[in-house]
Amino acid sequence: MKKLLIDCDTGIDDSIAILYALKHPRVRVMGICTGYGNSSAAQSTENTLRIIKLARPGYEVPVAVGAAAPLNGNWPGPNAIVHGANGIGDIELPESTQKPIEEPAPEFIVRMAREHPGELTLVTLGRMTNLALALQIEPKLPRLLRNVVSMGGTVFAAGNCSPVAEANIAGDPEAADMVMHAGFDLLLVGLDVTHKVQLTAAHLASLDRWCAPENRAIADYILGAMKHYFRFNRLADYDLDHCPVHDPLAMLLAVDPSAGVYRKMPARVECGGTYCRGMVVTDRRIVPFDSPYITVCLDVDVTRAVETLLAVFTEKDPAI
């Protein structure tokens, strides 16, 4: 059983990643931390609670509220064009009776890591602010967590919030740089691979037809939320009838890394600069600079990834 902690800014793709983890028969979600990004920390928390209710995992999943802004305090607010006014495509899910715990997310991460040393995989689907704050509380955190899988960054592909930067890393470069040179066993799942894994209308039609009866409400939510995501991606990608699933791919590889191709390399994040702030700077020279290595996913089995993602919600075994 894979034990996961999830840190997210629950938007459309975050919600699908969370649903994937909660419905996976060989995953136990030990808790979810929320923060700013796709929406405010408060809205992300509300979305997360409603997603847990939708999933009906059959066990308690504590939710801890995290950072409301980056380490430097400057956050312009969410972009409703991408994820909708409420962060989940303006779909109104039933309200949950569950409340977030009082413990702030960074403290929750530290406590869980201390209680389960070497057992937990932390999956970050948004900015790394909560993890950076947790690291300030407990400098030994890299040795307490089994590993960290982060959706963020790009090495060879173009950026999505600037020519060279990806939104999660650029949203708090100082936090990301702190995490990258702290010594975590860190896997970066960025735009190099997430743009390769695209959900199409045909994939959604298959989900609609073959979803397991107990997952009907989940499938209906995904279909509705993805309509908004498709509309945005048609505007951003010149009417192409598909869209990437950034966060679900990171979650999928956290559960089963065998679908990816990886390379270890030293990496830091550019925290200054007029044009390159938020860029992941990797050293691919024969003799690299002296910096801790991270692992970067550079390729993925696209067909397998899509089939595995959808299989959790159908009657197929997700370990295809």
Describe these PLM feature segments.
Residues M1, Y20-A21, R28-V29, A170, ...:
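Conformational coupling and interaction surfaces
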Residues M1-T10, V63-A69, I88-D90, T129-L135, ...:
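Short, mixed-charge, low-aromatic patches
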